[in-house]
Amino acid sequence: MSSLQRTAPASQAVSLPLEQVKEALGEVLNALQSPTGSARLEEARENSGNDLGKVLQLLLPAAVQIQQEVLQNYGFSADGEGVLRFARLVKSYESQDPEIAAMSSKLKSFFLPPLPLPPHAGLSAPSS
């Protein structure tokens, strides 16, 4: 087991220095963008369509599972709680490091479907 691969009980908080958080975040993004990760997410997106309920049922769990596979190498539990703990840790570093903030924003884009513009967007209001 490498020095980066630690296991921590689910109830134990994992604390990583900024550089290691950046490294883990980079690995998560790479996993989501890998051919396997992309295929899993694309399948979930296609099956979800524009239905937010289906996005929550299909896309979100697929993205969380991909994150879990990476984050357990950094001592986070291999469950949803581990992903939430990592998200809180990332949030705590966002204001300190613009690169982490940008990476975090990119990560969120995998979870949140693009929002369509309302049909009236960009049109001026009718005059009375």
Swiss-Prot record:
The keyword Hydrolase does not apply. It comes from the Eukaryota. Keywords: Cytoplasm. This is Protein C10. InterPro entries: P_C10. It comes from Xenopus laevis (African clawed frog). One of its GO terms (biological process) is post-embryonic development. The keyword Cytoplasm applies. It is found in: Cytoplasm. Its main location: cytoplasm. Belongs to the UPF0456 family. One of its GO terms (cellular component) is cytoplasm. Pfam families: P_C10.
